[in-house]
Curated annotation (Swiss-Prot):
HAMAP family, A to Z: GmhA
PANTHER family referenced in this protein's UniProt entry, alphabetically: DNAA INITIATOR-ASSOCIATING PROTEIN DIAA, SEDOHEPTULOSE 7-PHOSPHATE ISOMERASE / DNAA INITIATOR-ASSOCIATING FACTOR FOR REPLICATION INITIATION
Protein name, entry field: Phosphoheptose isomerase
Alphabetical keyword list: Carbohydrate metabolism, Cytoplasm, Isomerase, Metal-binding, Zinc
Cofactor annotation comment: Binds 1 zinc ion per subunit.
Pfam families: SIS_2
């Protein structure tokens, strides 16, 4: 079977881009460590993108609310584009450029992190979100395509992928997402962060056990009282 050049060409393009992106491993490490500190301390990650980048942003939040590899407590992470009712209401009432910015003002708190993904680095709604985040004291990270671009300039930190096609940029963004998650989990495993989250989970578990025990005790007491009454 003949494999057409564009097919293997994409693999070649991806291999080159991935090789170049290895030089950014220290940034994904730093972001993962920082995210562990923020989320482990009760903070939140907000994430947004358009189209394929929205899927990558939601992939990141899913890894944090669920898990990346091993079991661990859930952490607060919201993909802003996933709330279709809010997104469409804001677009209808305030315009598309405000769909993420208004949600950042609603959900973001000082010390939180906003992750924005854009292959062009020029999406107006993401630039507005970055402005809203900085005004709220929320740190802005961006995953973009080639530098320079407006989103890179409007972020606190950015990782720009040097690749000729949108598809390859998005694939490298997914690699970056997994690298960040690996660094995040490693920081938790080292015990540097997440003690509050783990402690909260343990406290919740203890409270639930106490409530179950109290309920059992109340039920047993009611049963004994009923038996005495029947006698």
């Amino acid at each position: 079977m003949t494999v057409h050049p564009p097919v293997v060409g994409h693999c070649d393009e991806l291999q080159v881009a991935l090789g170049a992106f290895r030089a950014s491993a220290h940034v994904t490490q730093r972001w993962g460590d920082r995210l562990a500190a923020v989320l482990g301390g009760g903070g939140r990650l907000l994430a947004a993108g358009n189209g394929g980048s929205a899927a990558q942003a939601q992939h990141l939040t899913a890894e944090l609310v669920g898990r990346y590899r091993d079991d661990r407590p859930p952490f607060s992470a919201i993909a802003l584009h996933a709330d279709t009712s809010s997104t469409t209401a804001i677009a209808n009432d305030y315009g598309v450029d405000e769909v993420f910015a208004r949600q950042v003002r609603a959900h973001g708190r000082k010390g939180d992190v906003l992750m924005l993904l854009s292959t062009s680095g020029a999406s107006a709604n993401l630039l507005s979100a970055a402005d809203a985040a900085r005004a709220a004291g929320v740190r802005v990270w961006a995953l973009t395509g080639r530098a320079p671009n407006p989103l890179m300039a409007g972020s606190d930190e950015s990782l720009c992928v040097e690749a000729p096609s949108t598809a390859t940029v998005q694939e490298i963004h997914l690699v970056a997402v997994h690298m960040i998650c690996a660094a995040f989990d490693a920081a938790l495993e080292r015990g540097e962060h997440g003690a509050r989250a783990a402690g909260s989970a343990a406290s919740t578990g203890r409270a639930a056990r106490r409530e179950r025990a109290a309920s059992t005790g109340r039920a047993a007491g009611a049963g004994r009282a009923a038996q005495r009454k029947r006698r």
